């Protein structure tokens, strides 16, 4: 998946650097889809990247700051949960590997790239995901613990009791 993310970053290299990923979908490839970039509006961009096995679809928004949304933990009791932390060093290593120059992914208060969060979700599900759709509601920061919770076919990520990511998946 890092190769797909690297390919998506390369496709978007000439875009303004203040784009953030707000939706991510990952599908097992069943057709002959091809890579493309499509402007939905002046602020919304869709990027589709493929390889032999996966279709990686990103919806990006020109939005410099996201307002946090909170959800009481009692609203969504977890059946599977993993508390994780992604260090600044891990984030820097990843961004240099995929040549990600997005300033949101740099520095002491960096936002964790979507592909690293996707890896954490795959760890919780032990790679048993065929298709996943994620909506990013608030940034997940480096060097701060976050929890990945899985209930039925829903996945959520909380950081400091703020709902950051919510999505669904199929096995």
Question: Which residues make up each language-model segment?
Answer:
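Active-site helix/loop of acyl-thioester processing domains in fatty-acid/polyketide metabolism
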Residues: 1-30, 94, 101, 109-130
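A conserved acidic, glycine/proline-rich C-terminal tail/linker
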Residues: 125-147
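Generic marker of "main functional regions" within proteins
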Residues: 96, 104, 121, 144-146, ...
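HotDog/MaoC-like acyl-thioester-processing domains
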Residues: 1-83, 140-143, 149-171
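A contiguous, surface-exposed recognition patch within enzymatic or periplasmic domains that forms
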Residues: 77-110
